[in-house]
């Protein structure tokens, strides 16, 4: 056996392998550098200022104004309050909103020291624990999509039924972290499969400008306020309907991506049907690309490339 020949062959094979590995490495490095330099850099353009942050813990309930909020994938959060994580349901589990019970918009739900505080006009405040692990989990429906909720108890049910002066029984449910969220793509195909919410109609975050509301209000017989449209983020220092063209936004440490316009059924009162034949689109729904913190007074930047 010629050991020198075997050694020479081994060296030759190692050189070929090294060349192949080195070539692959150069190719990968070249692709990475090419992507880096071919990709257009981001530009941040100032488009407005956050004038209000509003969280709606109870679906169709009264807004709670915030000075600062955490923006999670499923919407705004502040302490024990999370946006649209409580919901009124009928006995069959179907959601009850301001469409069915207009007085629901006057009900306030807040949290303090592990307790939920429920308030409404001409009603005594009702307090009950946020966590009630012994209560049953109810199967509920939001726009035909199944979702669960922890029943908040009989006392709360009696309070709601008395408030609405209803012959039917209403119950309050709470969405808990261990429960499976709704996939918004099941209702709106423009959403990605990974985008999820608890009890909102569709998107995690709704954004609207003061200028758009003022412009619209001037065209209506009875003026409207921002609160009527139930946004989470209200923007000032911009022109009417500028927000309709903001595809990607940076606010504080939060990055938002526009998904679709919001169908504002709230406008369709009998006196306004001469203006709108169907429910108009008003405000913009966003998903959360990057979670973080924002606050009133933060500058809003439009991201372009």
Regions found by a protein language model. Name each.
Residues 2-305:
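Metal-cofactor-dependent catalytic cores
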């Amino acid at each position: 056996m010629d050991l020198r020949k075997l050694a020479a062959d081994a060296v030759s094979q190692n050189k070929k392998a090294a060349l192949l590995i080195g070539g692959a490495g150069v190719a990968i490095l070249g692709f990475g550098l090419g992507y880096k330099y071919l990709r257009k850099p981001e530009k941040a353009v100032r488009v407005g200022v956050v004038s209000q942050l509003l969280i709606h813990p109870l679906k169709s309930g009264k807004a709670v104004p915030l000075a600062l909020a955490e923006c999670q994938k499923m919407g705004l959060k502040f302490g024990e309050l999370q946006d649209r994580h409580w919901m009124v349901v009928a006995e069959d589990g179907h959601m009850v909103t301001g469409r069915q019970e207009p007085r629901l918009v006057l009900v306030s739900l807040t949290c303090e020291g592990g307790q939920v505080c429920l308030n409404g006009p001409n009603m005594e405040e009702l307090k009950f624990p946020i966590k009630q692990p012994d209560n049953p989990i109810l199967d509920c429906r939001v726009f035909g999509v199944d979702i669960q909720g922890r029943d908040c108890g009989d006392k709360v049910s009696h309070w709601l039924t008395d408030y609405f002066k209803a012959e039917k029984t209403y119950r309050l449910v709470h969405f808990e972290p261990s429960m499976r969220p709704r996939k918004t793509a099941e209702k709106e195909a423009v959403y990605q499969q990974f985008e999820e919410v608890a009890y909102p109609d569709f998107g995690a975050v709704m954004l609207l400008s003061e200028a758009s509301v003022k412009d619209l209000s001037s065209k209506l017989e009875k003026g409207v306020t921002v609160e009527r449209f139930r946004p989470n983020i209200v923007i000032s220092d911009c022109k009417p309907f500028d927000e309709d063209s903001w595809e990607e936004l940076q606010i504080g440490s939060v990055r938002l991506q526009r998904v679709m316009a919001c169908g504002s059924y709230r406008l369709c009162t009998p006196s306004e049907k001469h203006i709108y034949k169907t429910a108009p689109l008003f405000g913009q729904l966003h998903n959360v690309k990057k979670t973080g913190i924002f606050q009133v007074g933060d500058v809003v930047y439009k991201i372009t490339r």
